[in-house]
């Protein structure tokens, strides 16, 4: 297959459909209404992701990463994830997970699917138990730097990157990547992307990745 050698996937709204990591965790903790309002304000550019993190971090104090993973496993994940990642990995494509949500969620997917690197907002933990204290904030600009830094260290240019995402946190990366797919995306992400795709099966990105690379 003729593919971009680096493909970056977003998490919330892209791989996790119809909800977010924060909303799933909030439902578990009985805080759904509060997080829904935070996410509305974030997508309206009224607040930054650090406000979301600071407000919700304390609710997770004393909860184990294993508990959180079990909650996330029951989420509505897009069809075709395993098959898509397997095809890309078999074509020697480096897979990155670029997200601004909690990094423990990204680590769950790295363990399951073998992403070369993942990003996210970090929380202190001891012996697998979350502290409720944010140790590193992460926003859409950090997400771009995460990809830029990984590419620089691994010998790739940003023109060799295909980015797949759905919303505000993907826009800076879309502007820098060689190819970008707005997948089931918001209008701002669609406007920033080189390609727009609506589908409930991730395998549909494969043909688009191949055809786009062939005309580069």
Where on the chain are the PLM-derived regions?
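Catalytic cores of large soluble enzymes that bind and process phosphate-bearing ligands
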Residues: 17, 44, 48, 60, ...
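Short, surface-exposed acidic
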Residues: 33-39, 65-68, 158
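Metal-dependent phosphoesterase signature
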Residues: 50-83
């Amino acid at each position: 297959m003729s593919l971009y050698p680096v493909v970056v996937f977003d998490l919330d709204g892209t791989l996790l459909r119809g909800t977010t990591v924060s909303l799933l965790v909030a439902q578990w903790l009985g805080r759904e209404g509060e997080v829904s309002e935070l996410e509305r304000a974030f997508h309206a550019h009224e607040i930054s992701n650090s406000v979301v993190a600071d407000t919700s971090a304390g609710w997770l104090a004393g909860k184990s990463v294993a508990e959180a993973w079990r909650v996330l496993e029951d989420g509505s994940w897009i069809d075709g994830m395993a098959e898509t990642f397997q095809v890309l990995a078999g074509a020697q494509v480096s897979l990155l997970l670029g997200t601004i949500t909690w990094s423990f969620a990204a680590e769950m997917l790295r363990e399951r699917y073998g992403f070369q690197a993942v990003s996210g907002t970090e929380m202190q933990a001891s012996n697998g138990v979350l502290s409720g204290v944010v140790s590193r904030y992460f926003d859409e600009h950090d997400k771009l730097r995460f990809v830029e830094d990984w590419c620089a260290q691994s010998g790739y240019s940003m023109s060799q990157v295909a980015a797949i995402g759905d919303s505000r946190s993907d826009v800076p990366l879309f502007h820098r990547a060689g190819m970008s797919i707005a997948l089931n995306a918001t209008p701002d992400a669609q406007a920033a992307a080189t390609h727009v795709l609506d589908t409930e099966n991730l395998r549909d990105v494969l043909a688009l990745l191949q055809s786009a690379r062939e005309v580069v």
